[in-house]
Regions:
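Hydrophobic alpha-helical connector segments
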Residues: 60, 73-103, 158-159
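Solvent-exposed, amphipathic alpha-helical segments
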Residues: 18-25, 71-76, 161, 165-169
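Short, basic, alpha-helical segments at the C-terminal edge of helix-turn-helix-like DNA-binding modules
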Residues: 62-70
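Short amphipathic alpha-helix in the helical subdomain of ABC transporter nucleotide-binding domains
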Residues: 8, 132, 154-159, 181, ...
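Helix-loop segment at the mouth of the active site in Rossmann-fold oxidoreductases
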Residues: 31, 152-153
């Protein structure tokens, strides 16, 4: 436990991490201000110095994780021509699919105040699924220009299909612990890229 008056670096991230661990371990019923600060090793009042309450913490946690994935996606167009298209898409798909644990995602959707905060932030321009989708589309356009995708590939639709399906998986299937996010991402990318690369995930990639 950190003593009063002693600065703790990256307090918000510590609180986010603590909340994620509690949600994964105990579910929403275990998420209290005291439980979070205890898990994070912070003073009891630390949470309310950074957030108005649990709803704001959950909303900011989700927005922070989305922003992190969006920053990763922003780098994709600059990596066109590197590795393989499949590998690059699997990396970003896996990052998005693992950005939130299922309980956190479910709580964000089912808590009206948190859901409203997230929606308002995204509408105001906070990076989220739309930004990730646009970065993927830009990346696919760059790969098409290099001949690593079929010329007729609808890159916008392909990006939408990838992000939309991962969003669905993120929100609906992670309660099943038998599911492997890496396998899910690989199967999805293989299916989506098949028609654009002659039916083989590596075919035609130079």
């Amino acid at each position: 436990m950190s003593p009063r008056g002693v600065a703790i670096p990256d307090v918000r991230e510590r609180l986010f991490g603590a909340a994620e661990r509690i949600l994964a371990r105990e579910g929403p019923s275990g998420l209290t201000s005291r439980a979070i600060t205890t898990e994070a090793g912070c003073a009891k009042g630390m949470l309310h110095k950074h957030f108005a309450g649990l709803d704001e913490l959950v909303a900011e946690l989700v927005l922070t994780r989305f922003a992190s994935t969006a920053r990763l996606a922003e780098d994709l167009p600059g990596r066109a021509g590197e590795s393989t298209v499949a590998a690059n898409l699997k990396t970003i798909g896996y990052a998005l699919l693992t950005s939130l644990n299922p309980t956190t995602a479910g709580l964000a959707v089912s808590t009206p105040a948190a859901s409203l905060r997230i929606r308002e932030a995204l509408e105001a321009g906070a990076p989220g699924f739309d930004a990730i989708q646009q970065s993927i589309a830009d990346y696919l356009d760059a790969e098409a220009e290099r001949g690593r995708l079929a010329p007729a590939t609808d890159t916008t639709a392909l990006a939408l299909a990838l992000v939309g399906t991962v969003h669905h998986l993120l929100m609906t299937t992670w309660g099943d612990t038998a599911r492997d996010p890496g396998e899910q991402t690989e199967r999805l990318v293989t299916m989506l890229l098949g028609p654009t690369t002659g039916g083989s995930i590596g075919h035609g990639e130079r």
